[in-house]
Regions:
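Acidic/His- and Gly-rich active-site-bordering loop/insert found
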Residues: 1-96, 117-122
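Residues within alpha-helical segments
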Residues: 10, 54, 87, 105, ...
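Conserved acidic functional residues
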Residues: 16, 100, 133
Length: 171
């Protein structure tokens, strides 16, 4: 199955996942990942949904970490568009979480989908650790999931965080 990064990003933006409310973002992501062969585990801590999805069982395990939650949009009347109804204008995706970081997640999922189609005999694992608790006080997200994974003897060898936090151009 081929996943469209733009369509997945739009679908994620349509989920008003304001911390800590998930609004279905984690389930949408899990559904897409399952369609390309990932085993998905939704891990709930208090009122926060988290996702650990893994493709493959061997090592090394390369993990992508990110979050689906967004900060509150404030007064919707101050927006020129509904922040949870994505639009593409001048080749730019506009909507709550487009930059931080729903489009990044969609691009990674699409890249993995393409990689899987071209590398059927890949020896190793690819995983995603996605939380719904990054924009808030972050007590029930990544830190707790990592502890949970350690208890389950799950090892992550390499990890990239797709968070767009550096304002400087690199490369």
């Amino acid at each position: 199955m081929q996943i469209s990064e733009l369509e997945l990003a739009k679908d994620l933006i349509r989920k008003p996942s304001v911390t800590p409310k998930d609004a279905g973002a984690i389930n949408l992501l899990a559904k897409n990942l399952r369609s390309i062969g990932f085993n998905c585990k939704i891990i709930n801590f208090k009122n926060v949904k988290n996702l650990y999805a893994k493709l493959g069982k061997s090592y090394p395990n390369f993990c992508y970490a990110g979050h689906t939650d967004v900060v509150p949009p404030g007064n919707i009347k101050n927006w020129t568009i509904n922040p949870f109804k994505p639009v593409v204008r001048n080749n730019k995706l506009i909507g709550r979480g487009a930059n931080d970081m729903k489009a990044s997640i969609a691009c990674f999922v699409t890249a993995v989908s393409r990689f899987r189609n071209q590398n059927k005999n890949f020896k190793g694992s690819i995983s995603l650790l996605i939380t719904g608790d990054e924009e808030g006080i972050a007590l029930n997200g990544t830190k707790r999931v990592v502890k949970y994974l350690k208890r389950k003897k799950e090892k992550i060898n390499f990890c990239i965080v797709g968070e767009p936090t550096n304002p400087n151009k690199l490369g």
